[in-house]
């Protein structure tokens, strides 16, 4: 249960704190100022989207033509924001469509913010053109992201894995 997990977490924290005070030079006078009131959940259920980003996609820096935002060196295709079985819903941040191991590598705050920006643009475009979210042209999202000063990942970095350099391998 959450309560048991929180107790175990606090117990581990105190053991580490005491170990550091007793065994690591410079920590003798350390003081614990506090800890989080509640345990944070980093990962739960994963969305099944039109595309599921894989660990290999993130590690290999796979570029997608339909990319609507970019992390450090990885790209998020528009389909990873669109749930497979639900129309007119878009998801951004740590809940986008991604494998568990890939999510651990790609849930940083800046790309989550960029996904949110892309999702907001997609919704605005859908509303303004009376379209379903699946019908929104990813190129229009990319164009608006660029106009707002964001990197939609439409231009692959020099170290990106692109379809044209996959064929060359």
Predicted regions and their residues:
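Non-catalytic terminal regions with compositionally biased, polar/charged low complexity
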Residues: 127-169
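Structural signal for hydrophobic packing residues in well-ordered secondary-structure cores
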Residues: 17-24, 123, 127, 149
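Short, surface-exposed, polar/charged, turn-prone segments marking secondary-structure boundaries
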Residues: 59-62, 117-121, 163
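Mobile, glycine/GP-rich and aromatic-enriched active-site lid/loop segments adjacent to catalytic centers
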Residues: 1-102
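Short, conserved micro-motifs enriched in small and acidic residues
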Residues: 3, 7, 106-114
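Composition- and surface-driven signal marking solvent-exposed, interaction-prone regions
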Residues: 2, 102-107, 130-138
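Internal hydrophobic alpha-helix adjacent to the cofactor/substrate pocket in enzyme cavities
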Residues: 113-130
